[in-house]
Amino acid sequence: MNSSTALMCFALLLISPLCMGYSDEDREADSRRIGEIIQNAQDDDSKINSTQELLDIYRRLYPSLSLEDRENIDKFVNEHTDAIVIDGVPIQGGRKAKIIGKIVSPAAKGLAVGFFEELGSKIAQLFTG
């Protein structure tokens, strides 16, 4: 009975890395994608349109981050998404971070672009150390 327990534990140790939700390959692919997003987002509209993809990458990365990193980025996201309004009205429906609208006032556009740039910088720093 003792050897079968040891064999089961050994098998679990071999299988457990395969069950992890965010592999090193996924992390590397997301790291490259962050670089592509930041490099390709040259104008304000492309930055605003890419914000949701940055947030999606952050959500995938979230479980593997330290508590300090998670709190830092969560605080930033919550502070800025609460402040985003379109034509003086808070956005409605779905997640607060979906800030894309067909008509965005210049002030909201500037805020959204700044949010994209800061979020991209914070997430990129997670990959570079």
UniProtKB/Swiss-Prot annotation:
Cell compartment(s), UniProt: Secreted
Protein name: Protein Turandot A1
One Pfam family in the UniProt entry: Turandot
Keyword Secreted: yes
Glycosylation sites per record: N49
Signal peptide residue numbers: 1-21
Family: Belongs to the Turandot family.
Domain of life from the UniProt record: Eukaryota
One GO-annotated biological process of the protein: response to mechanical stimulus
Entry GO CC: extracellular space
Described function: A humoral factor that plays a role in stress tolerance; gives increased resistance to the lethal effects of bacterial challenge and stress. Regulated by the JAK/STAT pathway and NF-KB-like Relish pathway in the fat body, upd3 in the hemocytes and Mekk1 in response to septic injury and consequent immune response.
Organism: Drosophila simulans (Fruit fly)
Keywords: Antibiotic, Antimicrobial, Glycoprotein, Immunity, Innate immunity, Secreted, Signal
